[in-house]
Design a protein with these regions (language model features):
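N-terminal nucleophile
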Residues: 1-171
Length: 171
């Protein structure tokens, strides 16, 4: 289960605060957070297998984080979701990153994901299960897991027990 907790516009001096874990595949090799890009400067861990990342922050104040999304759809997933995250981190704002993701899902096949983009002005959730849904977050604390966000859970038929348990744990 991957979990991402976003506190957006909750703290006066910190418009974006995040806590996250990546524990679905604990044996997957990764490198610790480091500067992975210079234009703009991006700090993120690196997935040693596919070369992307699952979470990061850039010099413009843009945060991008992703969780896998469990779906019943058979998705081709020809491009790494971590590369999508890395590329979104090259944008200047959450709105620009969201537009980039909207374009990327038209051009490439991805496995299911929940992708959060946030800066001081906007916070959005982009949910991909073969179709893209975009949700604007309101100021507050938001919990994103493999089956959805903020109590809007979509439990896949292939993993009903895991999905229900994940929703209960995140509530």
């Amino acid at each position: 289960m991957c979990t991402l907790v976003l506190a957006w516009q909750v703290f006066a001096d910190t418009p974006v605060a995040v806590a996250a874990n990546r524990d679905e595949m604990v044996d997957r090799p990764s490198e610790p957070p480091q500067r992975i890009d210079d234009e703009p400067a991006v700090i993120a861990p690196r997935d040693s297998e596919a070369g992307g990342t699952w979470i990061g922050h850039n010099e413009h104040g843009l945060f991008v984080g992703i969780t896998n999304r469990w779906t019943d759809a058979e998705l081709a997933g020809d491009r790494s979701r971590g590369l999508l995250t890395r590329d979104a981190l090259r944008k200047e704002s959450a709105e620009e990153a969201a537009r980039f993701v909207e374009s990327a899902v038209r051009d490439h096949e991805f496995d299911g994901f929940n992708l959060v983009v946030a800066d001081e002005n906007a916070a959005l959730l982009l949910e991909w299960d073969g179709q893209l849904a975009v949700r604007n977050f309101q100021p507050g604390v938001h919990v994103v897991v493999n089956v959805g966000a903020d109590g809007d859970w979509r439990i896949p038929e292939e993993r009903p027990e895991d999905g229900r348990q994940q929703g209960e744990n995140a509530a």
